[in-house]
């Protein structure tokens, strides 16, 4: 069985089509807990975000993860579990500790992925499983290639970087006053500032330049690259 979490961007409906299981990530909104794409739709989440209510994320409880694993093992001999990057959440390390009690039947992949790159790892795992690879072999292959990806993100506001403690209030205030669009980068386990732009058009241009540089210098040409686009409410 291949299992991931909702940070992959795989919806519950897509999971049924792919034949995988998606662990929903919990959100705490105004003191109440919701589960992504189960008790909280994406549209509803972004609507609440616009209301300026307090929103924080959490990792799935150990009980939830183990319950999903146990159910999967009723029909599968082993599991490949692909959580979000260990550099962005403690959920991966928690899963690694939980897997110690499963005698090798659960292989937790720590390949520093999230969003579209995490989704691609799930699809790659399915392909390898269809070829007869064991869960351990799949884990090793995915981790071997963990640095062979890049994500570039442009945000419309600095507000949530400030709330998450990734930038200081002073920097956020200056950036907001200048109407700057932050461009972030994920390579490996960390989310880092890449550049800023004064307009969305300029931000997109800078991302495209960075992607072109990656394609030519890191990945050896477009024929070696798989690209995806992710967006929210636009």
Enumerate the language-model features and the residues they cover.
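N-terminal glycine-rich anion-binding loop in soluble enzyme alpha/beta folds
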Residues: 1-59, 64
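Long, low-complexity, intrinsically disordered polar/charged segments
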Residues: 1-2, 73, 227
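Mixed-charge interfacial surface used for oligomerization/domain docking
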Residues: 7-21, 26, 78, 87-107, ...
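A generic structural signal for short
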Residues: 34, 57, 83-84, 159-161
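Generic signature of intrinsically disordered, low-complexity segments enriched in small/polar residues
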Residues: 37, 48-49, 72, 105, ...
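A short glycine/small-residue-enriched secondary-structure motif
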Residues: 40-46, 69, 96-101
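Glycine-rich phosphate- or other oxyanion-binding loops that anchor nucleotides, phosphorylated ligands
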Residues: 51-87, 93-94, 139, 146
């Amino acid at each position: 069985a291949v299992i991931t979490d909702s940070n992959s961007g795989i919806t519950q409906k897509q999971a049924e089509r792919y034949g995988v299981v998606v662990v929903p990530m919990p959100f705490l909104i105004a003191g109440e807990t919701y589960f992504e794409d189960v008790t909280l739709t994406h549209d509803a989440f972004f609507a609440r975000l616009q209301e300026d209510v307090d929103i924080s994320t959490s990792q799935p409880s150990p009980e939830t993860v183990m319950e999903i694993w146990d159910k999967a093992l009723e029909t599968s001999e082993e599991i490949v579990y692909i959580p979000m990057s260990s550099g962005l959440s403690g959920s991966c390390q928690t899963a690694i500790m939980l897997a110690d009690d499963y005698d090798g039947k659960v292989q937790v992949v720590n390949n520093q992925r999230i969003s579209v790159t995490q989704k691609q790892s799930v699809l790659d795992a399915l392909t390898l499983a269809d070829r007869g690879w064991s869960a351990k072999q799949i884990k090793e292959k995915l981790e071997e290639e963990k640095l062979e990806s890049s994500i570039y993100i442009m945000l419309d506001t600095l507000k949530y970087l400030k709330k998450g403690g990734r930038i200081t209030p002073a920097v956020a205030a200056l950036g907001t006053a200048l109407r700057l669009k932050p461009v972030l980068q994920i390579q490996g386990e960390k989310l880092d500032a890449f550049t800023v732009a004064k307009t969305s058009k300029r931000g997109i241009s800078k991302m495209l330049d960075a992607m072109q540089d990656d394609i030519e210098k890191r990945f050896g040409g477009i024929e070696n690259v798989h690209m995806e686009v992710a967006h929210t409410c636009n």
